[in-house]
Amino acid sequence: MDLTLKVWRQKNAKAKGHFETYQVKNISSDSSFLEMLDILNEQLIAEGVDPVAVEKGCQSSGPVSFDHDCREGICGACSLYINGRAHGPDDEVTTCQLHMRKFKDGDTITIEPWRAKGFPVIKDLVVDRQAYDKILQAGGYVSVGTGGVPDGNAIPIPNEKAEESMDGAACIGCGACAATCKNGSAMLFVAARVSSLALLPQGKVEAAKRAKAMVAKMDELGFGACTNTRACEMECPKHITVSHIARLNREFLCAKLQD
């Protein structure tokens, strides 16, 4: 298939960005979206850099920078806004799991980086997602002694609680929730992490401290507030539900009442 790509190009976080249009031809419907971008970059490298165009600010003319790692829907690095949707038109998949069969010959595809205050652009389609790491560092862990493996196996956990905890732990931290939210809120990410630990006996000990610390860090890093539009749930590639946000709100309120 032949496609027209409108790709966001931006030198760095402070530079003014713009769209550039490219043509790619003979793309297999079995190719992944990232493989299609690889083909585009091979094409741009073969064409070489036009110093005059770069000097005039008309064309970046170099390969398009985009982030990726595992290409298996695990790491969350391949974070792109495709035709106005986080990770593209398919449901419950990451960008690297999106295949070109979801598009038609002659389509125009608009590709942008994440759009959230907490994710500044590094270059082109690459954004800085360190904010999520900082939120995790604020409390997304268990620091109390939990014993060895035999001790963990000896603690009975109801199956329902274990399943809910694993649902939250499925979060890959891709940032689709914050990028999709009209307020740029990271509540679904924080809620998934808080919920996955608060449901377990080992994580319950620090539940109050964790909820307060992670919410405070989220606010400090410039993420917005949740207004219950549920766009985050719709675009999450792991289909993490807003029930975790409800649990985070309960944990946070109880923690504040204990102060």
Predicted regions and their residues:
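Functionalized membrane-embedded alpha-helices
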Residues: 74, 80-82, 232
